[in-house]
Amino acid sequence: MRRKRGAAIRNCKLRGEWAEMCFAARALREGLRLARPWGESSGYDLVVDRGSREMVRVQVKSTIFREGTGYSCTMKDSKGPYKKNSFEFVAAYVIPEDVWFILPEETVRGKWSVGLYPKLENSKYGEYLEAWDLLRGELPGVIARIEACAEEYFPQS
């Protein structure tokens, strides 16, 4: 039902606001700490606090627009494609599939739109599908910390 509700919001501005709330809810479930800038002139929608005085800016985008077997997601503001250092990540919500792409800024910089293919293996942006670890500052496939405990084992005869 949630997918249909978001897609049913025809006003792009309202759908964008709804997507920002969806991002905040999901980010909190992922254990991320969020802050929101005051006003709408920042060039990004939310801030993820990574701790240790490190924060990253996130621009939230959403799409319902089919493009073949995927979706086209606009990557621009009212002035054109996003410029360098506007934010660190784009969180792109593919509403009909209920999935997120967490895209580093350099992958979308200067582009008018990107094609997102959640069901296609080896797609251009496939490595960023549900890549919430990037917002935490973790590298995919890298174990940041391991904790273990062991006891001596003496088999009974």
Residues covered by each model-derived region:
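Mixed-charge (Asp/Glu-Lys/Arg
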Residues: 1-42, 47-157
